[in-house]
Amino acid sequence: MPFRLSHTGDIHLEEDRYFGDTAQCLEWFVCDGIRQNVDLFVIDGDLTTYKATIKERNLWIDMVIQMADHAPVLLVSGNHGRESDGDLYALAKARGQHRIHLSTEPELVEFDRVAVLSSRIRARRK
């Protein structure tokens, strides 16, 4: 039986810059995953450019709930450390029909039909 995964990352959602276009792309990502009946949504890292604004958080929470109403969601924190763990924690607390898991450290995450090794890679500083 095939396993369908929908994956994106490095969104860098920013209220002051291309917000409408980025929001439209996110909406397409969610709707396409739902249409294809994916088994897991994965969003890895850099959801926003800096600490999220209320508008950015609200959009992400709405999107995560839509995804979780159709399949489990894995959120992996980014490699630049620009989004605060508090922003991601709020997303992980959102509720849907399926599980939402936040990964801030490397770990093996098990879902119903698959296990995923999530790894937060930090940017090297010189």
Give names to the regions the model predicted.
Residues 11, 88-90, 117:
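Bulky hydrophobic/aromatic packing residues
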Residues 15-110:
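Core catalytic region of metal-dependent phosphoesterases/phosphodiesterases
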Residues 27, 112-126:
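Binuclear metal-dependent hydrolase catalytic cores centered on His/Asp/Glu-rich metal-binding motifs
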